[in-house]
Amino acid sequence: MDNSIQAHQKELCNKLWAMANALRGNMEAYEFKNYILGMIFYYYLSDKTEKYMVNLLKDDNISYEDAWNDEEYKAAIVEEALRDLGYIIEPEYLFRKMVKMVENRSFDIEFLQKAINALMESTIGNDSQEDFDGLFSDMQLDSTKLGHTVKVGGHGLRKTN
């Protein structure tokens, strides 16, 4: 395994442990595992989306973000991603963008909920819809155990970085 992959895995592991420790004080282990597992899976889907888009757009020399902002490209990449992946994560909802929001202290739980909703909505009417039904339902993002308000909840998750 190359060093960059090992470093990336170690960083992810450290962030997940930090998230677990931040949530541990507010809820039981069986409760916070739902958040951790949901975030791991969202990370996986986001990473897969980014790699897919890099490969899809490499010959066109355009970024995913730029392609998304061009209506013709957007229609084509949405169609391709839904056919090949069964879902699409919009550029603004990529996991790495959320990490930057956390670092900039602009992240909140409501944004994560919008990201998950957009992902789930992308599967509606596709063969993958049934596979995704209820996938993130155990992540109760409106739970007061994450904080009393959206911003406090976001602050609690900010501790993970």
Regions found by a protein language model. Name each.
Residues M1-N161:
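Non-catalytic, mostly N-terminal accessory regions of nucleic-acid modification and defense proteins
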